[in-house]
Amino acid sequence: SVAKHIPGHGCATDDSHKKLPIVNDNIKKLYFKDFLPFKNINSHFVMTAHILYKKIDPKFVATQSNVIIKNIIRKKLKFNGLIISDDISMKALSKNLVYNSKLALKAGCNLVLHCNGNINETTQLLKSLNKIDDFTKKKTHQLYEFLR
């Protein structure tokens, strides 16, 4: 099973399918209200939240935030499994699919989901990501090692 939406969705009041939820709470409140249920979770997989936590990373949503994925999910919550993005075509993300996907992978997501069923978007995304660079090889190797 996949635990979602890490690092937490409780303080968000908007639906990320429709628009970007913005949370202005400080990290201490978020830790005890949203993040704590994910600490030492017994799951090999988690799905990220498309939420902007302004007091943690004012520039990037959790899915695309190196600060949140590395410092909170990996270090503070001690999650060592596979991190999967939520659907990269959701309205919470305002940029194009390629940009959103690359940013999520660069931030630390191991897999990026594209789930809206639009085959033209999927084709565009796959064509633009088809060049296997060193970064993609590293991510693929991490996934392979995890699944072994």
Model-predicted regions and their roles:
Residues 2-136, 146:
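Second-shell residues forming the walls of enzyme active-site clefts
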